[in-house]
Each structure stands twice: as structure tokens, then as C-alpha cells.
């Protein structure tokens, strides 16, 4: 996490990137803050120390990149450290970063039933049942792996992870996937129509939420970002963990067989490597 004030700048990162960050920050104004190391201040503590008495006491961040739970915790900590306030609708990088990469446009593919073991419509039905049990009638699915699992779709937007950039809103009578059209092949579009999933532009989710009426919308503060959590349509909110994570954790027979087959292939690859290493040394 990078933090910039009028007079200083700092970067917080964990131990995986200490060496790389130290190298990259040489010759810059940024100080390296090693997370989870004794003596390293939190962002709020550092800001409370760094901001001069005559500085503006407002901290800006892009709420689209900050989970609601983290935003709430940071807001309280900033208040304790210097009486600072938090603004979550600020994306300065978008204003100054010319040529900033956009959302990836790689095509989405369908996960075959021979690997999924359960249809999308069946998963949506189970999710809707869980929502009612939790006192909700709809939910925002924000985790990319939750969306991919629910819809039996896969993508390549994140390196080494079969997910795609999207949002998903699930209601009792409908489901809406927010994704750029160019990512969908004719086959995937037809598949989504068959499964009862409507498609809207990726950037239109906030406008859509403002039109939602008479919903009890489940919002998981650990997965839904601060900006979306603060959008207010004509609906009540239910704060609770997303039911999808627990459902996804219980593997069906087809998924368990896939795990076994993957472990066999992985074991063969490891054995071949160890054999080569033993003979080469």
C-alpha cells in the first residue's frame, strides 16, 4: 500500500517483497515500511505523525480497492491518530496516469460439467436458499473466485489464477453478471442466457444497485468494497459473510475426483524432478 502526503511518501509491504521493494525504492522519496515487524507503524499511526498541524486533515483513498471492513477500521484508527477523516471516493491515479492499463479483455470460457459436477442453476438455487435463511433476498458477489465457481466460468485475467474481472448480483428471481461484452464469446453468452443470468456492462453496477427495489441485500464487508457498500438504492442491507465461500469449500464427488487426479499428476511431476535431481548432482 502506497501512501503519499504533501511532504512525504511511504510504501507498506510484507516480507515477500522486502528485498524487491528496497531495491525498487532506491533513489525515490518513498520510505519502506515492513509490515508485521516490531516498530513499524500502521498507516494511520504514520499519518498522525507525519501530517503537520496546518495540513488538511482528510485522507483520500479509492474505495473501489478497499473492502468495507478495512475502510471502517481505518476510519476509526485515523480518528484516534490525529483526528483524521477518511474519504473513499478519490482515485488520483486515474487523473494523472496516462496510458493506465484497463480491465483485461481475455475471453471467458465455460467449465465443463465433467469437472464442475454441478450446474450453475443448481448453485444459484442453493445460494438463494441460504440468502433466505440469512434474512436476505439478494447479494453482491465480489470475490472473483466466488463468481467463477457460481457460474461455472473460467478466465485468465489474473496470472496463474483462472478468474475474470466481473461483479455478480444474485436475487431470488434473477442474477446479473457485470462484465465487458467483449470478454464473452457467442457460446458463453448463449450459456448465460440458458442459465438465467443477465449481462450488463462492468462499470454499471453502482447505477444498477441504485435501481434495486424491495431487496434485503446481503453485503459481506470483508469482500464488498467500500464504494459499493455505500451505494444506496431502495433496499435494506444485511451484513453477513458471503454464503458462497462455505458452499464452495464442500467439494462434490466430481470435484473430489478432480483433486485426486491433479495430485497424481503433481506427484508424477515431482517424482520425475527428484529423480533428475538425484542423477544430476
Summary of predicted features, one role per range:
Residues 1-280:
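A composition/biophysics-driven feature that prefers long, compositionally simple stretches
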Amino acid at each position: 500500500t502506497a501512501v503519499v502526503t504533501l511532504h512525504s511518501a511511504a510504501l507498506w509491504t510484507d516480507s515477500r517483497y522486502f528485498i524487491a521493494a528496497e531495491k525498487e525504492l532506491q533513489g525515490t522519496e518513498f520510505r519502506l515500511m515492513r509490515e508485521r515487524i516490531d516498530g513499524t507503524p500502521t498507516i494511520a499511526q504514520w499519518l498522525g505523525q507525519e501530517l503537520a498541524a496546518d495540513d488538511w486533515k482528510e485522507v483520500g483513498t479509492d474505495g473501489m480497492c478497499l473492502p468495507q471492513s478495512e475502510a471502517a477500521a481505518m476510519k476509526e484508527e485515523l480518528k484516534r491518530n490525529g483526528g483524521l477523516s477518511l474519504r473513499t471516493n478519490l482515485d488520483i491515479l486515474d487523473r494523472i496516469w496516462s496510458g493506465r492499463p484497463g480491465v483485461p479483455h481475455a475471453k471467458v470460457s465455460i467449465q465443463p460439467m465433467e469437472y464442475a459436477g454441478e450446474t450453475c442453476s443448481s448453485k444459484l438455487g442453493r445460494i438463494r436458499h441460504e440468502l433466505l435463511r440469512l434474512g436476505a433476498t439478494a447479494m453482491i458477489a465480489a470475490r472473483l473466485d466466488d463468481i467463477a465457481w457460481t457460474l461455472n466460468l473460467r478466465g485468465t485475467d489474473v496470472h496463474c489464477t483462472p478468474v475474470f474481472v466481473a461483479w455478480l448480483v444474485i436475487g431470488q428471481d434473477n442474477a446479473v453478471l457485470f462484465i465487458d461484452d467483449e470478454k464473452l464469446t457467442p457460446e458463453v453468452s448463449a450459456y448465460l442466457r440458458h442459465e438465467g443470468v443477465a449481462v450488463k456492462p462492468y462499470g454499471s453496477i453502482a447505477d444498477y444497485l441504485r435501481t434495486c427495489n424491495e431487496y434485503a441485500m446481503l453485503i459481506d464487508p470483508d469482500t464488498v468494497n467500500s464504494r459499493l457498500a455505500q451505494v444506496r438504492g431502495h433496499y435494506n442491507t444485511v451484513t453477513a459473510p458471503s454464503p458462497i465461500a462455505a458452499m464452495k469449500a464442500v467439494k462434490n464427488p466430481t470435484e473430489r475426483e478432480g483433486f485426486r487426479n491433479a495430485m497424481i499428476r503433481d506427484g508424477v511431476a515431482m517424482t520425475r524432478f527428484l529423480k533428475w535431481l538425484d542423477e544430476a548432482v
